[in-house]
């Protein structure tokens, strides 16, 4: 079983894979250990950990000794990275593109986290860059800070209405 970790700015997303099939997934807070949320039987079956991290700390120090693959900007990816400043390109963005890349197809990868990122890979297999914009929490803070009447929303609905019928639902 493989444990795949994406350690972002605010939280850590994880996926458990058996062969190439997703077995389970979730999100944990940065200060929690993966061992505190997974069943000991599942933990004992993990033999490879693959991770990319934006921050330094990973929640795996309590795990048994298993092979750990740290993905970074020097890793080999299935496409060419055609980016002016590759040393500044977030590894989380490249990993998200790798997970979605299909040879011979162009793709736009949108990842919603602390920031919302948009990344484009051409049909010929060239990562060409993208855009970074504020995430949901930053957007809510901005709407409240820079308008007179929009309220601050600190919790948002996971499945909002398609068309809002109140100010909060519209936001």
What are these regions (language model features)?
Residues 126, 133-171:
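Active-site rim beta-loop-alpha module in soluble metabolic enzymes
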Residues 1-24, 100, 106-127, 143:
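Gly/Thr-rich phosphate-binding beta-strand-loop-beta motif of the actin/hexokinase/Hsp70
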Residues 1-77:
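N-terminal glycine/serine-rich phosphate-binding loop of ATP-dependent small-molecule kinases
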Residues 88, 130-131:
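A charged helix-plus-loop insertion that forms the helical arch/lid used to bind
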Residues 35-38, 78-83, 139-144:
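Short, charged, surface-exposed secondary-structure boundary motifs
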